[in-house]
Structure formats: structure tokens, C-alpha cells
From Swiss-Prot:
The keyword Glycosyltransferase does not apply. The chain crosses the membrane at residues 7-27. Pfam families: UPF0154. It comes from the Bacteria. Belongs to the UPF0154 family. One of its GO terms (cellular component) is plasma membrane. Keywords: Cell membrane, Membrane, Transmembrane, Transmembrane helix. The lineage of its organism: Bacteria, Bacillati, Mycoplasmatota, Mycoplasmoidales, Metamycoplasmataceae. Coiled coil: none annotated. It is found in: Cell membrane. InterPro entries: UPF0154. It is a single-pass membrane protein. It comes from Mycoplasma mobile (strain ATCC 43663 / 163K / NCTC 11711). This is UPF0154 protein MMOB4450. Disulfide bonds: none annotated.
């Protein structure tokens, strides 16, 4: 009976620790991902327009589409 209890305890605890590890890993990964998005937001067309205006150039739609296309191809 003692052997069965020990085996059951080992199996039960290993399952419990696996579940706890998965939950903790999920929340840590989510927090890290959200932090990365806050620090490095994805660039959009509005940001490219602002960049062109800061450089003193009038942004045309073709320039903006070209920059967006080159950004997608660079990934």
C-alpha cells in the first residue's frame, strides 16, 4: 500500500507542477509580449506620413505604400 501511495503522490504532484508551470509560463510570456509591443509599436501608414512631414517632404500615397511594402519584405 505504501508503494502505491508513493507512486500516486509522485504522479499527482508532477501533473500539478506541470499545470502550474504552464499557467505561470503563459502569464510571464503574455507580460513580456505586451511590454515589447509598448516599447516597439508596429509602424503604420500614419507614422510614415508623420516621418515624411518631419523630413519636410510631402508624402504621396505611392511613397507611403512603397515604404510599407519594403517594411513587410524586410521582415
Amino acid at each position: 500500500m505504501e508503494i502505491g501511495l508513493a507512486i500516486g503522490l509522485i504522479v499527482g504532484l508532477s501533473i500539478l507542477f506541470t499545470i502550474v508551470g504552464l499557467v505561470v509560463g503563459f502569464f510571464l510570456t503574455k507580460r513580456y509580449f505586451e511590454k515589447q509591443l509598448r516599447e516597439n509599436p508596429p509602424i503604420n501608414e500614419k507614422m510614415i506620413r508623420a516621418m515624411f512631414l518631419q523630413m519636410g517632404r510631402k508624402p504621396s500615397e505611392s511613397h507611403i505604400k512603397s515604404v510599407m511594402r519594403s517594411m513587410k519584405n524586410a521582415k
